[in-house]
């Protein structure tokens, strides 16, 4: 197979009125019954207790408030109840995680003082470099950066009981970005996106929404809410933007750019978003290596027959036969009956409450340890390992299918807890072995976090998360339903709990991978895009703009399964290892597909190609980790603080072409690598050799002294300012 079109760039330098102010303005208007939309402004008052806060009385008794936080950041809240809650209302009182990293009163903010000016038909409210203009008659708002209007409402804010709708004017050349993990998209102009968890993992679905968007015209909006929403960026009316959330309050942070141009605006928008919601987490270095996930505590195995045949060819030719093992069970509730070997973490059987365990043996070849050995034997770099990723799988078999042991007050008996401790010790043994091979361990957090009060729960499936971290030594977590529910406040609270437990219990930076993210998720972990079918070009195609879009939405840490969790194909698998070498997270989600999901499954040339790219990623790790630090908003001295690892072309090129869908299948990986994955069959031969067209090479220099792009593998040079075919 030909290698992907991947270039590193070599930079070639070219020859290169305030009329009056008042604390309070009051206007006469007739008393009316409360109604929607807003019908006008009665008074505007600078708060006596905080000079950066402005209180607004709209007609019909509706209250509003503007809080200036920085030169280009303010909060606009219209609350019919007049309560102005500090934080968004969670979906449950038990959800304590917040969207914001700190309250508005924090000294983190400079809090510029506000001034209020009567302009006749309108009121101008200025704080720092941002000015909010309210129309007296309609309450319609517009925002200025200096003298430049960056956005204006084309209709009054509508506070209906069923939802709150803001209608904005859309400029012809204005482009829209953000919204979280919008599968298959990074540019949302003239489209409608769902700010809700659609549980659809393919093109057009939304895996981890984020109520944050920004535009090329110089403003961004973060809706401070956990309610579902919908953002129409000109789909219904090309001159109008309509954003709505299912709640009877408008609460939003506005980010106002001081500069123009897509790349400058994008940088400001991300910095402002991080100022309010917190910097992205810097994952541990091992988190950027390949991870392996499967269940090794549930099924039965044989070398002769079984429910599912798994063949591994390693470095043999893809045309030769490989090593074969057979697995049976693979579902919740499977119980060994004494005819098959048991899979285990360590190649060892249980020692506590073993009366229900019926297995022919506990052969190490069917263990999680053996899988680590497989990666080592095939010279494949591996960073982390989850041995319980499967329904009905724990991390030990002590108390195998034993139930009961629940006291009248819901606590567990000593015998029940002893089985849990024995299983944690089993996990600890596996962690120690994995660590000796340079591999970190973690768990899929599908079940409860501590021994539950259900007497019907088999003891070997009970969890003790605190002990898993402190004794078991895990530092990686992949969240699921029990942790993040449907997302929103449930999801944010779950991932914060996971982050806090590892950081306080183990005093280590965790590697947390989650689905159903929201605004603020970036403080705690990375995004996983969901369960998808591999084995087809579509799987690679739609993920490229997905990664770009997520990175423009404030979370630079993103990953997905190698060749999907289901299905599979040798060529697609190899191509996936190629391009995802130049992405943050890579997951071998094994046990569900047509083939074993690993880089050594299909034999050469596929095994060799996958090995080459995994080793290349290892060689590039200093570069990758430096880029990850920059993405975490850490100043590395390279001038790219706050920029994501996967960078849309518009982040370095202000041209209209770079900010269009013409560049949706390429990106910059860090500062110096342009990555253009092979994502379709253009004119492939039977071995998968193909070409890649439409590669845009920007020119940051001049026509006389252009940027030179160098093919990373061949050394061939290309002039910037062309589309390469």
Walk through the language-model features, giving the residues of each:
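Bacterial Sec-dependent N-terminal signal peptides
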Residues: 1-17
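A low-complexity, Ser/Thr/Gly/Pro-enriched, surface-exposed linker/loop concept
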Residues: 36-47, 67-121, 159-165
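Catalytic and substrate-binding clefts that recognize carbohydrates or anionic sugar/phosphate headgroups
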Residues: 58-59, 79-81, 102-350, 354-360, ...
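Carbohydrate-binding surfaces of carbohydrate-active enzymes
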Residues: 48, 56, 60, 374, ...
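Bacterial N-terminal signal peptides
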Residues: 15-26
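Sec-dependent signal peptide cleavage junction
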Residues: 25-37
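Aromatic- and carboxylate-enriched substrate-binding clefts and catalytic-loop regions
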Residues: 99, 153, 180, 384-610, ...
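Aromatic- and glycine-enriched glycan-recognition loops and surfaces
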Residues: 263, 304-455
């Amino acid at each position: 197979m030909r290698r992907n079109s991947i270039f590193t760039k070599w930079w070639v330098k070219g020859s290169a009125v305030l009329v009056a102010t008042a604390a309070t303005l009051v206007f006469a208007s007739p008393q009316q019954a409360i109604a929607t939309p807003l019908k006008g402004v009665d008074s505007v008052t600078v708060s006596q207790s905080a000079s950066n806060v402005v209180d607004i009385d709209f007609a019909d008794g509706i209250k509003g408030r503007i809080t200036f936080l920085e030169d280009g950041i303010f909060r606009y809240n219209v609350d019919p109840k007049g309560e102005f809650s500090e934080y968004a209302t969670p979906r449950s009182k038990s959800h304590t995680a917040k969207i914001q990293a700190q309250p508005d009163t924090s000294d983190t903010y400079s809090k510029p003082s506000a001034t209020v000016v009567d302009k006749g038909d309108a009121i101008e409210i200025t704080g720092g470099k941002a000015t909010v203009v309210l129309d007296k008659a309609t309450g319609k708002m517009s925002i200025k950066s200096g003298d430049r209007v960056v956005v204006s409402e084309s209709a009054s804010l509508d506070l209906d009981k069923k939802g709150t709708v803001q209608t904005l004017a859309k400029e012809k050349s204005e482009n829209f970005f953000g919204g979280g993990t919008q599968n298959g998209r990074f540019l949302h102009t003239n489209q409608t996106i769902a700010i809700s968890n659609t549980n659809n993992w393919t093109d057009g679905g939304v895996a981890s929404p984020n109520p944050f968007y920004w535009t090329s015209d110089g403003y961004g909006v973060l809706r401070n809410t956990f309610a579902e929403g919908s953002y129409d960026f000109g789909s219904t009316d090309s001159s109008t933007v309509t954003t709505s959330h299912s709640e009877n309050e408008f609460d939003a942070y506005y980010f106002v750019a001081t500069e123009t141009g897509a790349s400058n605006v994008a940088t400001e928008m991300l910095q402002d978003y991080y100022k309010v919601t917190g910097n992205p987490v810097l994952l541990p270095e091992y988190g950027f290596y390949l991870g392996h996930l499967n269940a090794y505590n549930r099924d039965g195995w044989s070398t002769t027959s079984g429910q599912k045949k798994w063949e591994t060819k390693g470095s043999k030719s893809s045309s030769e036969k490989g090593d074969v093992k057979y697995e049976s069970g693979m579902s919740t509730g499977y119980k060994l009956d004494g005819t098959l070997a048991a899979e285990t973490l360590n190649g060892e059987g249980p020692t506590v409450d073993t009366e229900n365990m019926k297995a022919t043996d506990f052969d190490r070849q069917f263990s999680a340890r053996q899988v680590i050995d497989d990666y080592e034997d095939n010279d494949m770099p591996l960073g982390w390992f989850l041995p319980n990723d499967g329904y009905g799988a724990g991390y030990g078999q002590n108390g195998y299918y034993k139930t009961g042991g629940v006291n009248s007050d819901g606590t567990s008996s000593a015998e029940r807890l002893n089985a849990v401790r024995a299983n944690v010790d089993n996990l600890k043994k596996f962690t120690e072995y994995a660590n000796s091979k340079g591999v970190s361990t973690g768990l899929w957090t599908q079940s409860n976090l501590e021994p539950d009060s259900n007497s019907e729960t088999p003891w070997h499936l009970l969890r003790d998360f605190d002990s898993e971290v402190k004794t078991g030594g895990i530092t990686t977590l992949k969240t699921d339903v029990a942790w993040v529910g449907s997302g929103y406040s449930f999801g944010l609270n779950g991932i914060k709990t996971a982050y806090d437990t590892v950081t306080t219990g183990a005093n280590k930076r965790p590697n947390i991978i989650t689905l159903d993210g929201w605004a603020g998720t970036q403080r705690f972990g990375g995004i996983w895009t969901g369960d998808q079918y591999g084995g087809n070009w579509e799987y690679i195609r739609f993920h490229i703009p997905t990664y770009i879009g997520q990175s423009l939405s404030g979370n630079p840490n993103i990953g997905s399964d190698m060749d999907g969790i289901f299905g599979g194909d040798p060529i697609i698998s190899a191509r996936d290892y190629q391009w995802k070498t130049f992405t943050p997270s890579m997951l071998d989600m094994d046990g569900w597909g047509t083939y074993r999901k690993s880089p050594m499954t299909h034999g050469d040339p596929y095994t060799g190609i996958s090995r080459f790219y995994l080793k290349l990623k290892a060689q590039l790790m200093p570069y990758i980790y430096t880029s990850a630090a920059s993405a975490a908003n850490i100043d590395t001295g390279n001038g790219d603080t706050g920029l994501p690892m996967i960078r849309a072309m518009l982040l370095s090129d202000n041209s209209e072409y770079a900010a269009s869908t013409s560049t949706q299948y390429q990106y910059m990986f860090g500062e110096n690598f342009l990555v253009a994955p092979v994502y379709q069959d253009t004119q492939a031969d039977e071995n998968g050799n193909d070409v890649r067209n439409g590669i845009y090479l920007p020119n940051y220099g001049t026509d006389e002294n252009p940027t030179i792009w160098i093919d990373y593998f061949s050394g061939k040079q290309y002039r910037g300012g062309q589309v390469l075919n």
